């Protein structure tokens, strides 16, 4: 499976698609990426989503899963699979616990965000994937603010449920480097 660049004849606009091992575009991914291009998402966003969904469909192919019948447990296994080095992803090589993760937390979270958008898009088309990666949490639960600042009209939305991702990895926040006097 690979990501292929597509240049539209006439307009010259650039897009991306995921091509399977049979050299045919993967239909559900192609439909989603065409939707992103039609609502004028950045070509870089379309390219990143194509790479992320290529990883998802590669995982599904390795494990013999149907994309329409996945569960949250499969997504958790996908996260663990992403953290493995590429040579160990086929399952024939064991990885020692001392080996560093291949994908960092921020990269995995971006891939999960792409997968959540993909599932939400297809849920609107009738595929039963709506609650796979997004849960509704009561308002006020979750991350607490360090300050007491509340935006104007915050009291209006305090009783509505908020969307939360079901799986999120901690991503280290990079610290700025200190400038030297020299």
What is each PLM-predicted segment?
Residues 30-44, 54-153:
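N-terminal core-binding DNA-recognition domain of tyrosine recombinases/integrases
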Residues 2-39, 61-62:
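N-terminal DNA-binding module of tyrosine recombinases/phage integrases
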Residues 1-12, 104, 118-129, 180-182:
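Contiguous hydrophobic segments
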Residues 92-96, 100, 147-182:
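Long, amphipathic, Lys/Arg-enriched alpha-helical "connector/arm" segment
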Residues 17-21, 28, 46, 155-159, ...:
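Short, flexible segments with low predicted structural confidence
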Residues 1, 37, 106-107, 146, ...:
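General helical secondary-structure elements
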């Amino acid at each position: 499976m690979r990501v292929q660049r597509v240049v539209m004849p006439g307009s010259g606009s650039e897009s991306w698609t995921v091509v399977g091992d049979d050299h045919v575009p993967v239909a559900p991914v192609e439909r989603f990426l065409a939707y992103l291009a039609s609502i004028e998402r950045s070509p870089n966003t379309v390219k990143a989503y194509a790479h992320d969904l290529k990883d998802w469909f590669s995982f599904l192919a390795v494990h013999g899963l149907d994309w329409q019948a996945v569960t949250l447990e499969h997504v958790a296994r996908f996260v663990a699979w992403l953290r493995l080095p590429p040579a160990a992803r086929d399952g024939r090589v064991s990885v020692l616990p001392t080996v560093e993760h291949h994908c960092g937390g921020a990269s995995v979270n971006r891939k999960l965000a792409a997968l959540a958008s993909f599932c939400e898009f297809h849920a609107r088309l009738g595929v039963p994937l709506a609650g796979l990666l997004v849960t509704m949490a009561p308002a006020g639960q979750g991350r607490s603010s360090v300050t007491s600042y509340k935006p104007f009209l915050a009291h209006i939305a305090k009783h509505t449920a908020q969307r939360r991702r079901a799986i999120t990895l901690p991503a280290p926040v990079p610290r700025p480097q200190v400038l030297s006097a020299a």
